[in-house]
């Protein structure tokens, strides 16, 4: 039995979960509405404010889908109540980020600024540098965990951190494996 899959999901007050045809799960909450088509063979039951996920058999596919299905529903419930966020750090001399309306404008050492329009249900928060050497904080915020992660990865891919000085965009919790520079000639 899947340890994650057998845990029930408690639906908080103010959140409405609808399980439709072919396991189309729709979650409405204070921050918005999320809808996702889950595997039709999984058994999703709602009793009051508790949702449970069961699998029809102990086959390899159903075992794999059990925990996944439960986690996807749980992520939707958390997303419409608290939301999801992914923190990034921008390191490098002259690397900047600013918001123009909802558009994120990044100066990353290219000959032009990079403009990123946010997808629906995604917003950006740009922090302040405390000193010139401190990294600049950038946070991607939204209700869909997968979409927040994809958007953060897309921003990071514009200038991934390099191993010599650590310049670039990295996740806040990410550790960069640093390399030593050239040894140089002895004089």
Swiss-Prot record:
GO terms for biological process: cytoplasmic translation. Residues 151-170 are annotated as: Disordered. The keyword DNA damage does not apply. SUPFAM superfamilies: Ribosomal protein L6. The keyword RNA-binding applies. Coiled coil: none annotated. GO terms for molecular function: rRNA binding; structural constituent of ribosome. Pfam families: Ribosomal_L6 (PF00347). GO terms for cellular component: cytosolic large ribosomal subunit. It comes from the Bacteria. Keywords: Ribonucleoprotein, Ribosomal protein, RNA-binding, rRNA-binding. Part of the 50S ribosomal subunit. This protein binds to the 23S rRNA, and is important in its secondary structure. It is located near the subunit interface in the base of the L7/L12 stalk, and near the tRNA binding site of the peptidyltransferase center. Belongs to the universal ribosomal protein uL6 family. This is Large ribosomal subunit protein uL6. It comes from Chloroflexus aurantiacus (strain ATCC 29366 / DSM 635 / J-10-fl). The gene is rplF.
